[in-house]
């Protein structure tokens, strides 16, 4: 149970509440704790979550709320497709450090072994403009002490 080298979770953490609900009993802190337990010492947790600061900046710059709405509230295309929490680098780093992670850092999705997988770690605005757009995902790695 404690031997994983890497856990990768792309746009998962924001779907867990701060406090448990009957229909969503796990909190994001419990999820992070579970992932921490599953990693071996020196193992890496690689997260991608909506970058709340980037979404706010894009909205303030463009006044186009429709383009950033899903980053705040989730896509809402099906049950449970909504967000309970938003993250900045500073808030995520603080939580990861308090849970026993170290060396918290932003990673470049282009440098990962899964760069060819078109997932939300590559979410840009304007939509999928990876050359001129702004990355809307906060991509963070942390190492288990």
Q: What are the language-model segments listed below?
A:
Residues 8-15, 20:
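Short catalytic micro-motifs in class I SAM-dependent methyltransferases
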Residues 17-143:
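S-adenosyl-L-methionine-dependent methyltransferase catalytic module, highlighting the catalytic core
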Residues 1-8:
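A short acidic, Gly/Pro-enriched loop at the edge of an enzyme's catalytic core
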